Regions:
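Soluble "head" domains of membrane/secretory-pathway proteins
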Residues: 1-208
């Protein structure tokens, strides 16, 4: 049973969705907010064959657990989820414990590499982050690291090309030193962590 009243029902052009066209989603006012460890049902926000840009697939639903909220800073240490300033259990402890003890996970078909797939960060499924999860009206200084982490989100919000060139971030034709997010985002995880396509692999989930 899904309670759509928490964040508000969504309105979109179903005919455009059936024709595999981009859709604009309008969300009605909700009665509350999500909490860590809530189970979320959502549309997959990336193209299935490529995760480098956001495109809502309103005909495809995923079910995952909310690990981090807008404004949180998330890490994975030794295979266990951590949110700074939060001491309670996050996600499926048994699955995290299994992953933490597993020798050579790639030999079992587990994909070790993670979002944002950039060797300069060195992230993997057992050592990941810190990753600040953007919240609406939160600003970040734009540099190479924040470009790597947030380029999909910024390109989606602004509907413009973003690139890192000559040590600077360009949005369209404009130089960007700081960016203020227009949306809230979440980090979600499947309970079967050894076999789950979730935020560890494709990135952050837009609130829409």
């Amino acid at each position: 049973l899904v309670n759509k009243m928490i964040k508000g029902a969504r309105l979109f052009n179903v005919f455009a969705a059936l024709n595999n066209e981009d859709v604009t989603i309008h969300r009605m006012p909700g009665l509350g907010s999500f909490k860590r460890n809530d189970i979320l049902v959502f549309n997959f926000p990336y193209q299935e064959s490529r995760w480098d840009s956001i495109r809502m697939n309103v005909m495809q639903y995923y079910v995952k657990r909310c690990i981090a909220l807008p404004g949180d800073t998330l890490e994975i240490r030794g295979g266990f989820y951590k949110v700074r300033g939060y001491s309670e259990l996050l996600g499926n402890y048994e699955a995290q414990h299994y992953l933490s003890k597993l020798q050579h996970p790639e030999a079992r078909g587990i994909v070790v590499g993670t979002f944002p797939y950039d060797g300069s960060l060195g992230w993997n499924i057992r050592e990941f982050g810190p990753l600040p999860i953007p919240r609406k009206e939160q600003s970040v200084i734009m540099n190479h690291t924040t470009y790597i982490l947030y380029r999909q989100l910024i390109a989606w919000e602004q509907k413009k090309k973003i690139e890192f060139k000559d040590g600077q971030v360009l949005l369209g034709d404009s130089l960007v030193h700081q960016y203020c997010f227009k949306k809230n985002y979440y980090f979600v995880s499947g309970d079967n962590m050894a076999n789950s396509q979730d935020s560890r692999y494709w990135g952050m989930l837009p609130e829409e």
